[in-house]
């Protein structure tokens, strides 16, 4: 489990409002780190308040280990 510590600048710009809100809601909360992709980005998995499953890819500097 990791914490998303910040949202990369411009990351939300082209996303639907409901996806933007879901990502804002997990900021600073524990989410599942699935793996790192070939580009070195962390694949995060989480469910929003409605139970919708989301995946997002961020550079490692935007996450920390959750204890």
Model-found features: residue ranges?
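Basic/aromatic-rich interaction segments and small domains that mediate binding to polyanionic partners
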Residues: 1-67
